[in-house]
């Protein structure tokens, strides 16, 4: 059965690659989604990421793959090609949920064909309608953090705006997911709970992680009042408040993620997660709930914009 939550025993996983990762020339989509807070975009470097970043990221991804294989988890990889953006984060472009494999209508136009690099591993893909770029982006968001990048005309969202808890999908409204996107998922028969006014920048998986049924890890800098900020269906869940993360830094002048990569962990099963190797304060908190941590490197998580949840796509979990 396809994966339908974040915690059941992992059976088959797609792991990204860093080959030929790009910082594309700045378009309206990149300007509004990625760079709205930047005044002078002329200082933004474009082109391939430095060779050191690519090499070290691929080394760490191989270490992750070796760990999966030792856990008897089947590993699948994208094809190496020349992407418009990268193939590092398969989580961002495809939603797996129960009977659905959905290629999502991503916020960055440059990423909408990214999923085809691992298409050979997917059966019966539903391809969401492509948004109209001419009307999608709200340029008023530039230098105004109170305005989101996406207009509410066409459905538009990254798959990583969503986390799964069996029949329920939790959907972050942000620069990479509009309310129309949640409506589209409901039209496919999904139960969708929107989360708003929590984190505007990009994805949900540096703010909330589901560890097992009824237990979640929360970012205390973004979630300050559970009953006001989260859907009622989560109000009775037990909470682990993430301790301050250890900042692993980033390649000079290239930062694509906040320090909160500790929350961007991956559950192997309800009692084991993969955690960035420096986050021992979180490891200690997880142990209090009977959750062990495999401490692995991901040196360029902040540079490339993704730690273990982002760089993987759990295709099959053995549901308990």
Regions found by a protein language model. Give the residues of each.
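The feature marks the mature, well-folded catalytic cores of soluble enzymes
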Residues: 1-320
